[in-house]
A protein has these predicted regions:
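Catalytic cores of secreted/periplasmic lytic hydrolases that degrade extracellular macromolecules
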Residues: 2-53, 58-171
């Protein structure tokens, strides 16, 4: 996994601790990491920064969730591999899965970008992103609507779209 080694080096040098103390700093830290990581991809492979920010807000409660604090996991990334370092949900200590532990929060963003770019579950996301890139019209709500598979919650995309709207109002 050369991309991971490269990304880890980049992430470790890019605000590895993300020492945010408020929502504005959280947004700026996630933005800085995402912009830097996106620079390693061609334009049509980049994940929109505001989508990453909105999803990290939603998944990590503004970086304050247990999984974000203890596992540097800003995006609720699960693992089913018992060999991976992971945190189990407190209400499901015997779950067959856990939330993956990352060295840095930026590494979790890198993993998320790779997931969207290469995992077959996100083909619809990539197709929609390419159509939007080709037409020069970015519609984050439409992109978010392709991410239903990301979570078990049947209302996930609606919640993500609401977070995008709140983020836009927040700015």
């Amino acid at each position: 996994m050369n991309w991971l080694c490269t990304t880890l080096i980049v992430c470790l040098t890019l605000n590895s601790e993300m020492n945010y103390t408020n929502n504005d700093e959280f947004i700026e830290d996630v933005r800085a990491c995402t912009v830097h990581l996106n620079s390693m991809y061609s334009e049509h492979e980049r994940v929109p920064v505001d989508l990453v920010i909105a999803q990290s807000i939603h998944e990590s409660e503004w970086g304050r969730s247990r999984f974000a604090v203890e596992g540097n996991n800003l995006l609720g990334i699960r693992t089913f591999d018992p060999a991976d370092d992971q945190l189990k949900p407190l209400n499901k200590p015997n779950a067959s899965w856990g939330l993956r532990i990352f060295e840095t929060k930026c590494e979790s963003i890198s993993y998320y970008i790779e997931l969207l770019n290469y995992n077959h579950h996100y083909d619809d996301f990539r197709e929609e992103r390419l159509m939007q890139y080709s037409s020069d019209l970015v519609n984050l709500e439409k992109l978010a609507s392709t991410l239903a598979i990301y979570a078990e919650d049947v209302y996930y995309t609606q919640k993500l779209i609401q977070t995008l709207k709140e983020l836009n109002d927040y700015k």
